[in-house]
């Protein structure tokens, strides 16, 4: 599919070298933070990768469907003479971010949706660059693209020396990190190409380990169908697995960038138009459900988050309210469940109500089951009903303990973070002992930790106190160093009697060995409760210490793990050594 080379602009090699230097010097004044030049040769090595990506079902559906158009640069029917890649840096930190309070919980937009829509920002910068070039080269032919164009922005940027392609699939600049927007110009000016960046990720796998859904299936390999960023932008129903992982995200996901060491300490706030409005990028969830189309456009219209309309964001707000277990949201969620014309929101509201629980939630579910006609929504209502019944039983078992704790005032939950070979761990403990180990930072797990505390602790307050977690952290470091096989730490288990029975059974699995769910079920005298054992295993609050990574499928296959399968494999390999 090689195209005829476009008519080259009039000039000499010396002319283009001088112009290139002029462009580099002018770039900051045009709103460009990094600029590079590349050949316009076809991206032939990319073709096999894209074809395999498609064959495996990893595409999002947002890409250009014609792979050849993504491989062969095209300038109005001809092959351009060269490519110019640009990068605009954006903020990673928010000044005075509002916090979620009880009854006033907030969602979050990914940083790529902070401030003015980056498509507009990039186009404005590239149009200034086009004008700059055209003024000096009247017969220049120029065409700009952002991520809605045919070419792969990252492939162009990598060839042009903007940065290297990280294991999280992001373009990582040696100076700007991955907090950058990318765009490119195709031109008939034959600029001398820049050298690619030789830096890389090395042995680091923090992004792979931290990905909430395991969407990073390998270094530089993304299954978009599992990516939280993609999932938040879809318009249909979402599986419970994904709704739990979305947390309070309304649009996008930054986890793989937050944990990246190349981004440590980097924050770019020199583009005023990209400065986030805290009330827009971290909005209260409940009011989002009442937004009209006009109100949504007025509030979010300038953000990149608006491009899919209000339905995905409202659905995600419902998910967030469910994950926060916001009791104050039950009336509004009941209204959505019973009256909203959109089945996706009705079904999601049923799920959210089952997460929150309580008599009012059960009443709403029963009312909906009598009137709902949509088949998939009816299924979600039935599932919600079953979960609420299970919750009632669990609450009866734990109510006495919770009442005793409530009478003594809020329980302090101490937390701290530690870096390990499998990524960041957040440790939590009460005065009784260690109560949780979570994969990821406290920031990333805050919604999950709050909902857990509301369910199992009652009144609570989280306080960062490294000293309270010092002994647990030290024993974990010894484990990762291969110097410890057993732990001697005081625990504070919070779960149903059956769950606690399963969790304690996990402690009996020998170091370096694996057992099946069936083995665990038999060990506690519940041979027929294999599925229930699996459910309890999935809710294990103390992975590693209660080694659920040593549990395999019936045929010895790897099964899901809270930290993701790559982490599970690492732990098993560590114990083999």
Mark where each language-model region is.
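Alpha-helix N-cap/helix-start positions at coil->helix boundaries
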Residues: 307, 311-312, 327, 341-344, ...
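Iron-sulfur cluster-binding cysteine motifs and their immediate structural context
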Residues: 32, 206-229, 248-273
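Structural detector for internal amphipathic alpha-helices that build alpha-solenoid repeat scaffolds
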Residues: 314-326, 346-358, 378-390
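C-terminal amphipathic alpha-helical segment
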Residues: 240-274, 286-287, 291, 295-319
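Basic nucleic-acid-binding alpha-helical/helix-turn surface characteristic of O6-alkylguanine DNA
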Residues: 394-527, 574-577
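Amphipathic alpha-helical scaffolding segments comprising HEAT/armadillo-like alpha-solenoid repeats
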Residues: 295-299, 326-338, 358-370
């Amino acid at each position: 599919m090689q195209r005829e080379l476009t008519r080259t602009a009039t000039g000499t090699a010396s002319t283009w070298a001088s112009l290139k230097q002029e462009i580099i010097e002018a770039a900051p004044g045009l709103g460009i933070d990094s600029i590079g030049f590349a050949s316009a040769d076809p991206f032939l090595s990319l073709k096999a990768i894209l074809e395999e990506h498609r064959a495996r079902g990893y595409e999002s559906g947002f890409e250009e469907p014609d792979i050849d158009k993504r491989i062969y640069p095209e300038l109005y029917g001809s092959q351009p003479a060269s490519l110019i890649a640009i990068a605009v840096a954006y903020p990673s930190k928010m000044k005075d971010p509002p916090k979620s309070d009880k009854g006033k919980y907030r969602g979050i937009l990914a940083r790529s949706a902070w401030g003015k829509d980056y498509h507009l920002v990039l186009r404005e910068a590239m149009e200034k660059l086009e004008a700059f070039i055209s003024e000096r080269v009247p017969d220049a032919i120029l065409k700009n693209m952002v991520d809605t164009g045919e070419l792969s922005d990252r492939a162009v940027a990598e060839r042009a020396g903007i940065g290297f392609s990280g294991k999280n699939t992001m373009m990582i600049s040696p100076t700007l990190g991955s907090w950058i927007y990318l765009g490119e110009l195709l031109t008939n000016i034959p600029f001398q190409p820049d050298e690619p960046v030789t830096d890389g990720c090395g042995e680091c796998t923090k992004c792979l380990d931290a990905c909430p859904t395991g969407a990073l299936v390998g270094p530089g390999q993304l299954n978009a169908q599992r990516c939280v960023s993609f999932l938040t932008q879809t318009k249909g129903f979402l599986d419970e697995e994904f709704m739990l992982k979305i947390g309070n995200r309304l649009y996008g996901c930054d986890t793989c960038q937050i944990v990246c060491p190349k981004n440590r300490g980097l924050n770019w706030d020199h583009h005023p138009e990209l400065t986030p409005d805290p009330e827009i990028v971290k909005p209260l969830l409940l009011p989002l459900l009442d937004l009209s189309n006009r109100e949504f456009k007025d509030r979010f219209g300038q953000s990149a988050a608006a491009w899919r309309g209000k339905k995905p964001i409202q659905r995600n707000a419902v998910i967030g309210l469910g994950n926060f277990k916001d009791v104050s949201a039950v009336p509004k969620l009941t209204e959505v469940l019973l009256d909203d014309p959109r089945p996706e929101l009705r079904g999601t509201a049923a799920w959210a109500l089952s997460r929150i629980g309580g008599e009012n939630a059960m009443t709403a579910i029963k009312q909906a089951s009598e009137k709902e006609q949509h088949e998939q929504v009816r299924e979600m209502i039935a599932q919600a009903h079953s979960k609420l019944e299970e919750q009632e039983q669990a609450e009866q078992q734990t109510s006495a303990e919770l009442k005793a704790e409530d009478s003594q005032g809020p329980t302090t939950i101490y937390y701290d973070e530690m870096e390990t070979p499998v990524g960041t761990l957040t440790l939590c403990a009460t005065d009784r002992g260690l109560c949780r180990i979570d994969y990821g930072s406290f920031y990333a797990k805050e919604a999950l930790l709050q909902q857990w505390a509301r369910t199992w602790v009652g009144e609570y307050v989280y306080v960062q106190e490294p000293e309270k977690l010092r002994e647990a952290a030290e024993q974990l470091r010894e484990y990762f160093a291969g110097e410890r096989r057993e732990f001697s730490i005081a625990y504070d288990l919070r779960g149903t009697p059956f769950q606690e029975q399963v969790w304690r059974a996990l402690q009996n699995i020998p170091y370096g060995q694996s057992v099946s769910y069936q083995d665990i079920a038999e060990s506690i005298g519940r041979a027929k409760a294999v599925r229930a054992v699996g459910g309890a295993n999935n809710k294990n609050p103390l992975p590693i210490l209660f080694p659920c990574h040593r549990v395999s499928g019936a045929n010895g296959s790897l099964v899901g793990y809270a930290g993701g399968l790559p982490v599970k494999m690492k732990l098993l390999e560590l114990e083999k050594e």
